[in-house]
């Protein structure tokens, strides 16, 4: 047994000396496949990532994640976030799953003369037509929605886009 340990130690020392990197380093993280449905664990991870970015930006946000049907999977309110931001974030997550498009894209379409003029007054007022909502996709299929509210429309849009990018590249 001590002979086996000696071989392992020799191997580690040789590797450290040969390439200058520690053989004891943990292996690089392996990217996981994008989930095929929204789970509570995935929603919590995504919310945590968006909240971290919101802190960096100085935004007190509410972050909501829904499943493919627009039903809430998880919502978190950062300290001192606006009370109204809760419903707005949840409704952004609903909107993007319902219409399969980012909420920022609805502003032009919902303007007078636009092809979706007045859509924000449908679905009991749950359709949001300003930035901060992003559909979460896997293989071209919407599996969930992300809604962020608490900053300006531009800040919410940036946080939503960050969340979508995180979902696509880090999860």
Which residues does each predicted region cover?
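Flexible, solvent-exposed loop/hinge segments and secondary-structure transition points
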Residues: 3-171
């Amino acid at each position: 047994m001590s002979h086996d340990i000696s071989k392992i130690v020799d191997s580690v020392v040789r590797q450290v000396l040969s390439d200058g990197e520690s053989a004891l380093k943990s292996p690089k993280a392996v990217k996981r496949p994008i989930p095929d449905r929204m789970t509570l664990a995935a929603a919590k991870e995504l919310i945590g990532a968006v909240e971290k970015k919101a802190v960096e930006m100085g935004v007190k946000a509410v972050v909501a994640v829904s499943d493919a049907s627009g039903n809430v999977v998880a919502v978190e309110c950062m300290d001192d976030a606006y009370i109204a931001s809760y419903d707005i974030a949840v409704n952004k997550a609903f909107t993007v799953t319902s219409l399969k498009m980012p909420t920022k894209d609805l502003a032009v379409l919902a303007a007078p003369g636009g092809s979706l003029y007045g859509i924000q007054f449908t679905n009991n007022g749950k359709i949001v037509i300003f930035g901060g909502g992003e559909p979460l996709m896997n293989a071209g299929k919407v599996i969930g929605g992300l809604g962020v509210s608490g900053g300006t429309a531009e800040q919410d849009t940036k946080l939503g886009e960050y969340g979508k990018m995180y979902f696509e590249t880090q999860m």
